[in-house]
Each structure stands twice: as structure tokens, then as C-alpha cells.
Amino acid sequence: MTRYTYLFILQIISCSFAATWVKITKPTITWEDMEVSLEGEKKFFCGEFDSSFTGRYHWRFNGSSILPERTQIHRNQFVFLAGANAIRNQLPGEYECCVRETLGNACYSRMIVVQNRTDNHNIDMTNSTLLLADEGNTYYIRMHDVKRVEGVKCTLDGVNVDNFKYPFLGRQTKKTVPYHLKIENIERGGEVNCDLRLHKKEIVQKTFDIRLLRGFISSSQLPQFVYLIVFTIIGYILRL
Ligand SMILES: *[C@@H]1O[C@H](CO)[C@@H](O)[C@H](O)[C@H]1NC(C)=O
Ligand SMILES: *[C@@H]1O[C@H](CO)[C@@H](O)[C@H](O)[C@H]1NC(C)=O
Ligand SMILES: *[C@@H]1O[C@H](CO)[C@@H](O)[C@H](O)[C@H]1NC(C)=O
């Protein structure tokens, strides 16, 4: 075989492989174990073999170019923006980036898993007006000391929100319901206003505040947070 025939065969082989990507699987990352930057973001690199690669990176999520909400690609890094934690249940899956390295066409793929942290909390707010909640958790809330309700409607800071769910209440429901409002994957605090329609069309209202614990305080919010504490202390001293 001459040198040219050899090169020719090589050429054919590389052409037939041009459209195929070699898939290289990187170790799985657990969402909870990813580092959080000062901006509240979680990032990861493609993890390509040739780190001097300067071409385009193509990112896919579960095989689709439609990336999850609250994510972005920044300088070849995949970034989960601040606030992604609240929707972490939507983020598990396969994140894949493809690079055309000199070594070949490779897709580096890794799974991100989210631990089952969907803590469900049953809260009785009958005698309480403040709910201290953990971002991302789900709350089943009782609001009034009644056996039967025929309808519930709530707003958060005056608007309807999608993650407020209500128990199924059939017209002739004889059964009592264990909760009046379910807040799925709680995301922000505010004032909740509810109308509970009781038997015989009586309406009772319930208002309470949600304050997020362990909510992320971004560096831009930090000064405000410090001022708030300082003013609270000053206010306290002046009142004494
Ligand atoms: C992505 O794939 C994972 C499993 O590979 C699956 O659990 C998850 O629900 C998928 N997510 C979406 C949004 O398709
Ligand atoms: C997650 O944990 C909760 C409470 O421990 C459990 O009820 C639920 O079935 C679990 N979900 C999955 C998908 O494992
Ligand atoms: C709420 O307060 C009433 C009256 O003080 C009391 O009877 C009831 O047990 C309280 N409920 C809860 C859940 O603490």
C-alpha cells in the first residue's frame, strides 16, 4: 500500500465519522453539592479534553437545545442563575456540550441529579400570621379551624400565582380536607390573602405573611440587609 492510498483510506474513514459525535460521559454532579458563587449562581464547565479549545460550544439539555429556565451559557460555562434553586426539581437531566476539538468531534455529557429534598411540611396557620419557609419546599397549610370548606382562593401580594394549589373540593364533599392551600416549591415571600368559602356561603378571610429562610441574599441586596438590621436596632434603642 502506497502512502497515498493509506492517506486516502484515512480520509474516507474520517469523512464517514465527521457526522458522528463521540460521546464522553463525565461524572454525575449532584445539584446540592455544586458550589454557589457570590452571585448565587452555580456553574460548570464542559470538561473537554483539550482545554485550549476556542471554538463554539453547543449545549443541550436532555438532547434538546431548549435549555431549562433560569440557566444561561456564559463564556462556555453552563450557568444556573440565582433563583434556579427554587425550581431545582425541573433541573435534573443530562447536560451535554459538543466541541470540535482537533482530537475529533466529541460530546461531553454529564448528568445533574437533584436529591429528593421535596420536604413536605404540614403547617397549621390557624393561630399564626407568619410562615417561615425554606425556599423550594412544599407546604400544606390549614388556615381555619373548620371541618368543611367549599372553596379556597388565595393571592400573593395581590396576584394569583401558579404554585398555589387548592384541594379538590367536590360540591357535595362530605369528607374533610387535610389542607386548604398547598404552596408548591415555594419561591418568594409576601403577603398571602385567602378567602375560604365555608358551608352556607359564609366567607372567612385569612391573611398571613411568608418570609423565606435561607433565601439567597445576593451581594447587591446585602447592604440593604445590613441597613435593615442597623435601622431595626436604632429603632429599638430609640423606643427604649
Ligand atoms: C431529563 O432527563 C432525566 C433523566 O435522564 C429526567 O429525569 C428528567 O425528567 C428529564 N427532564 C426533562 C425536562 O425532560
Ligand atoms: C421524596 O421524599 C418524600 C418524603 O420522604 C416521599 O414521599 C417521596 O415519595 C419521595 N419522592 C421520590 C421521587 O422518591
Ligand atoms: C388556636 O387557638 C385556640 C384558642 O386559643 C386553641 O383552642 C387552638 O387549639 C389553637 N390551635 C392551634 C393549632 O394551636
Swiss-Prot record:
Signal peptide bounds: 1-18
According to the lineage, what is the superkingdom?
A: Eukaryota
Keywords (alphabetical) are: Glycoprotein, Membrane, Signal, Transmembrane, Transmembrane helix
* CC per GO annotation: membrane
Q: Where in the cell is it found?
A: Membrane
Give me the segments passing through the membrane: 215-235
Glycosylation sites (chain numbering): 127
List the membrane topology term(s).
Single-pass membrane protein
Protein name as catalogued: Uncharacterized protein ZK512.1
The major lineage groups are: Eukaryota, Metazoa, Ecdysozoa, Nematoda, Chromadorea
